[in-house]
A protein has these predicted regions:
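Hydrophobic alpha-helical connector segments
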Residues: 70-101, 118-121, 135, 141-145
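Append "Primarily bacterial transcriptional regulators
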Residues: 30-34, 43
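Amphipathic alpha-helical segments used for helix-helix packing
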Residues: 90-111, 123, 154-162
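Amphipathic C-terminal alpha-helical segment
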Residues: 147-165, 180-189
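N-terminal intrinsically disordered/low-complexity leader segments
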Residues: 1-6, 187-200
Length: 200
């Protein structure tokens, strides 16, 4: 890419491509500079440094994931929406492994405040509207869904299931079905360890 065509967007796109091809750990200022055909110093005209570069790629991945989830869940509700939501995450993780790695980074304040992050959060909460989860429990339910999906995908990525012959697709479907049942029977009140009646 000629230097004249460089922009913040082009640099971030290059970082995301590099992450998918070589892994998120391969993304450095020097490697991205090589990717776009300039010297590392030229990149600093467009990004403040490595952290800003990774943040940009993180936000890019959030935006792409949000778009994929929105398309998948459009017009669906309840279990159908949940399955589409989960499958969209799995497809993105499979199709963009490096970008998925970037999504597992601890989000910076600017990433958390981005419209892309807000959209992912809104889509998650919208998916939960098809279940009888009380308003004050929706954040907990969203964390539960996220932990289940991300945990399964992380284990798959690390070949944790490779030693068994049972198909991972069947395990995935069972996990999503279990999520559906848990959300459908989410209790109206939660008992926390600090509650007096639960400390006997």
């Amino acid at each position: 890419m000629p230097r004249a065509n460089l922009s913040h967007t082009a640099v971030v796109d290059a970082a995301a491509r590099l992450a998918d091809r070589d892994g998120a750990a391969a993304v450095t200022v020097s490697s991205v500079a090589r990717e776009v055909g300039v010297k590392p110093a030229s990149l600093y005209e467009h990004v403040a440094g490595l952290s800003a570069l990774l943040d940009g790629a993180h936000v890019l991945a959030l935006g792409e994931l949000a778009a994929a989830v929105a398309d998948a869940v459009a017009g669906l509700a309840g279990a159908d929406a949940l399955r589409a939501f989960a499958d969209a995450h799995r497809a993105y993780a499979t199709g963009h492994p490096g970008r998925w790695e970037l999504l597992q980074r601890v989000a910076s304040p600017s990433t958390v405040a981005s419209s892309e992050a807000a959209r992912v959060g809104s889509l998650t909460l919208a998916t939960l509207r098809g279940y009888p989860v009380p308003d004050d429990q929706r954040v907990h339910a969203a964390r539960f869904v996220g932990a289940t999906i991300n945990g399964y995908l992380a284990l798959t990525r690390n070949d944790a299931f490779a030693h068994r012959v049972e198909p991972t697709d069947a395990s995935w479907r069972a996990a999503v079905d279990a999520l559906d049942r848990a959300l459908a029977t989410w209790p109206a009140e939660r008992i926390h360890p600090s509650d007096p009646e639960n400390t006997a």
